[in-house]
Amino acid sequence: MNKLIELYCAICHHSEDSRIAEKMQHGSNNKSAQFTDVELMTAYLWGAQQGLLTRKSIYNFIRTYHLGEFQKLPSYQAFCRRLNRLAAAFAALAEVLFEQKLASSEPTHGYVLDSCPVMVSVGSRSNTAKTARDLCNLTRNPTKNLWYHGVKLHVFAQLRPRKLPIPCAVQISKASLCDLWAAKQIDLDCAPVADGRLYADRAYIDAEWRSHLQTERNVALITPRKRKKYDVLVSEDAVSTRISALRQPIEGFFNWL
């Protein structure tokens, strides 16, 4: 119970941040709602912390075990409708929390960049998928050698010794968007990394962007060398293996998600 109260108080505190406040429903009919936006966000995040993955399971959990704390819990339809309206507020809250975590962490000057496919449907079903077409589209995943309908999650993160990396910037794009283009846009929008080394895979090899990062951000972009046909240089294999090892924490982060 104490942790639930702590979560509620934390969201109350963060809701005063202008980035979150302007995205919450203070100017809507929910301003006078008996079940506040802070309560709604608390209920959803509390359910997610219990390992529940769907809105339905979270709603049923709150209704079954925490109706005493959330006495004005609305209907399931209203719960989902208001969650949709608060999507931007959740994103702003994540941004604030990431900033706080980065500020309290020892700077390592080591960063990692990667993307992760979020597959809504795969295989033969992907050709006829209609889910969230304004966000999703069809593309092929070369790693898994399959076609899928979905989105792609792009992450810049700060490396930490023996811990999961802390995201510096996160963006969702359509699945077909090139990783390099997405990374360039994120860098242009918010310059998430500075003064260090950025480890990435071959998808991000680009001489112009490498020069830009070095000149404008003081960041060295470190990628495996593109192997040429009949290339058997063992030393380059060792470098690629080392870079892959340094990038491994981001894979752990994606698996954790």
What are these regions (language model features)?
Residues 1-257:
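Short alpha-helical elements
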